[in-house]
Amino acid sequence: MPPTPILILDGGLGTSLQDHYNITFSSDTTPLWSSHLMISDPKTLLSCQRDFTTTAAVDVLLTATYQVSPEGFQRTKTPSHPSGIPRASIAPYLRTALDVAGQAVQDTSASVALSLGPYGACMIPGQEYSGKYDGEHDDEEKLWRWHTDRLGLFDDDEAMEGKGLRERVKYIAMETVPRIDEVRAVRRAVGSSKGFCEGVPFWVACVFPVEDKDTLPDGSTVDEVVEAMLLPVEGGATPWGIGINCTKLHKLPRLVGLFGDAVERLLREGRIQERPALVLYPDGTQGEVYNTATQTWEKVQDKSGADDSRPWEVQLSQVVNDAAATGQFSSILVGGCCKASFNDIKRLREQLRPE
């Protein structure tokens, strides 16, 4: 069996900006969160993203667009847009985000992935850990329309500088999805944006924040999630990769095993024909938990994974190597999410690719 290729993804952009560049965020003043820097401070954004491409030497860098949405821009008040940034004025900022990522990977071998979070990441307070959405976005059809509309923001000559999407990015990342109906909705959004997204592989990564349960916040099992990710969906595109992000590291060994088992079952039953890539980027937290009410990271007594005192990168590299050894995935893309710094990713790369 040939070895499974392993690629390195970057870490948590928002928390890196907070922890290493003293940037502060709040839903009142920066409703776009880390995406706000494409408006306020592209230079600092570039420095932070370069930390990942130079020091950490990642293979894939996510754009600073995770929280992008028409609603988020409308809530963002600037001197030139004191009442909020209208839809007609969004494109130049998206171009800035793509340009900054492009500059960060310049003179490196890294590629860019367009980062797109779930609807819950654009709510105030954020609901990507709960999946508790408002009535206007509470089923697959409504979420499909929202995601299609959000993708449409990028399908703009000014945002793309007249280029196709695949000239600007190598991947699309649909991230931190907490609901099974939203998994299907994002696949349909990519499918219905076929002309724009054509030729750009995408991944869907879900969040598993419920302690002692291997389910999404909506109760969906891994088997159900993998089926929603890979089985035919009317009008939906098939992802290149499936996986897990924004989830505690100690949950990964079991979850990855369940993902692999689900893939094997679908192959055995003839319901899928190809192995997907596995995409993993767990939180880099050391006991901190994000409080959506106070919008801060708080240290809590968390014994859930305390029996493993090995460094984050050692634990994660073992999960990756174990998954690679099964041959269940076509390749593995691994990095970090919240609180994972460029130094963490550098150490992860050194674990997986010792010189």
Q: Model segments located where?
A:
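Domain-level signal for soluble alpha/beta catalytic cores
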Residues: 1-355
